[in-house]
């Protein structure tokens, strides 16, 4: 749908949490919204293609190095199916599944050879044979399952975005510490071997000083009614939690510290969630990040990380297994490959198991996730995007929570 100037609301200056932070928002007033639910995710089709490429190959023996844990999954959606596929391919089928609808859980278990279907979530948590839980439900439900699973002494791998806001993540981290278990964010970027290799090389000083990250992510999702999760505030819709987490995560991996200063513009949909945004970040070391996100405008998924001696370009970066380094002195292009897109979810399982075994580098991944969550939370609040679960915070800020 095209938006003309007279359908745009005014711009507002939003008070910032620090003097250097400025934010503006405009509220987009659509005449109507289509009743068509969003088309299937491009990412899902890409993942299917990646899985097809690996399904006839022997599973790599070097992915899983730590002692094996017994896993159960909460939820039976697209990402849960992808995880079940790759684990079955690895010869490590999931040990259990729980879902709000028991019939879906039974069908899921039959499809992937899952050992046990739980009649309730409490039954799963009480099963001493389950070591770790993978949470795949909508963003706004994560904190409930995190509280329950962590308190039950289960290690947890939780899909992105791991929580609604930084306060919830702080609570979950405290629970994990209290109960002596590992909590891990399942944002794929944190686990892909490609980025681990590039960060390793960066840390040797080979690339020189990191100066700037430029990251785009734009999808085209049809406007729909509130059953469309992308625009539904009651399902924590909006671009930031759905795709912004990828953009911020890849930049954070290469930056010395999290951003302190933010300057941003955002448009909200009529449902009140963030639809399109552009923002610039700067950390204490002076490293800049320039980002653009959209749920209603297609953009290439492209990340460019610039250093003194080179820049790195990664396309389709959420599960990338290759990138290009362009060297400043002679323009030489170096192709770097590591890992395989189709094994993205296996790397997540492997990283949690390694963290449980005491791998300090894997344990540190949650620190990156916490930095990203803090930035996402600050930006959303500066744009006036609060979810129903954040109604009290919205009232204190003098705005109404989306979907309230």
Spans of features found by a protein language model:
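Predominantly a Rossmann-like dinucleotide-binding segment in NAD(P)-dependent oxidoreductases
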Residues: 189-262
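Hydrophobic residues in well-ordered beta-strands that form the structural core
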Residues: 158, 183-185, 314
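C-terminal helix-rich "cap/oligomerization" subdomain common to oxidoreductases
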Residues: 34-65, 132-134, 351-404
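Rossmann-fold dehydrogenase core element
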Residues: 171-188
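Beta-loop-alpha module in the N-terminal Rossmann-like domain of NAD(P)-dependent dehydrogenases
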Residues: 83, 101, 112-173
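N-terminal Rossmann-like dinucleotide-binding module
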Residues: 34-112
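NAD(P)-dinucleotide binding in Rossmann-like oxidoreductases
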Residues: 268-274, 284-353, 361-367
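Short, Lys/Arg-enriched N-terminal segments with co-localized hydrophobic residues
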Residues: 20-32
